[in-house]
Design a protein with these regions (language model features):
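A structural alpha-helix within SAM-dependent methyltransferase catalytic domains
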Residues: 74, 98-101, 124, 147, ...
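C-terminal helical cap(s) of enzyme catalytic domains, especially alpha/beta-barrels
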Residues: 192-202, 224-227, 240-245
Length: 245
């Protein structure tokens, strides 16, 4: 599935570049996305995800109301959002981020499939505080370049991976936070224990990172299990959107 999404993104990029004008006069001070997350007083520090659909779940919210969802997250104590902007498979829109930012004071991770440095400048231009990089979609050189560009723009970076083969690519990146996805983006299968397994198996390489556990959480007991095992940072979407958590 990941390869298909990336190919679609490549096909769309030229059109996107023609359609969107990058604002070059932006405040490049650090956005402090992760600092805000770390400073949360919540037992579980959750990045709440907003998305209308996904390849694994189909339509998640038929009655999709962007601002109501964001306000509900804020009222529940969530200080950081992840907003899907990918159009074809998640039915996202780039306009979602400025729409939220114009109304609400909250940190936003742009959730998309970044394969070109232009997308980083665009993320900054629309008001994102943090970008997602997917290790499986990028070379080691691209990862390092994109992190450098993001930092120059004042953006935080969440670099995520699923496959343990990616460890060699990410072990020495200049980041303090890393995401481990419980979902295999090629098969879309989810293993709720995957993040803990990878963290423990590669503890020498990963011990310096704050780890964000991503995908598959549907019960409070699962969050408790992770916290007991030393991880209290989470990225959760579907279960929150459906009211399961």
């Amino acid at each position: 599935m990941l390869d298909q999404i990336i190919q679609t993104k490549k096909d769309r990029l030229n059109t996107l570049k023609e359609h969107y004008i990058i604002n070059e006069h932006l405040d490049l001070k650090p956005t402090k996305f992760f600092q805000t997350l770390f400073e949360s007083s919540n037992v579980y520090k959750i990045i709440g995800e907003i998305k209308k659909a996904s390849p694994s779940a189909g339509i998640i919210k038929e009655d999709f109301d962007l601002l109501s969802l964001a306000k509900n997250y804020i009222s529940s104590g969530i200080s950081n959002l992840s907003v899907l902007t990918e159009e074809d498979y998640f039915l996202g829109q780039y306009e979602y981020i400025p729409q939220i930012k114009e109304t609400l004071d909250i940190k936003i991770l742009q959730k998309d499939f970044i394969i070109d440095e232009w997308q980083i400048y665009h993320a900054k231009s629309i008001g994102a505080d943090c970008i997602l990089l997917i290790s499986e979609a990028l070379t080691k050189a691209e990862i390092n370049l994109f992190i450098k560009i993001a930092k120059e723009q004042g953006l935080d970076v969440l670099l995520e991976f699923h496959n343990e083969d990616e460890i060699t690519k990410i072990a020495d990146v200049e980041l303090d936070v890393i995401g481990i996805n419980n979902r295999n983006l090629h098969t879309l299968k989810t293993d709720i224990n995957h993040c803990l397994h990878i963290r423990d198996k590669y503890s020498d390489q990963l011990s310096r990172f704050n780890i964000v556990a991503e995908s598959g959480f549907s019960k409070k007991s699962e969050l408790e299990m992770y916290k007991t095992n030393g991880i209290d940072l989470f990225l959760i979407g579907e279960s929150l959107l459906k009211g399961k958590l």
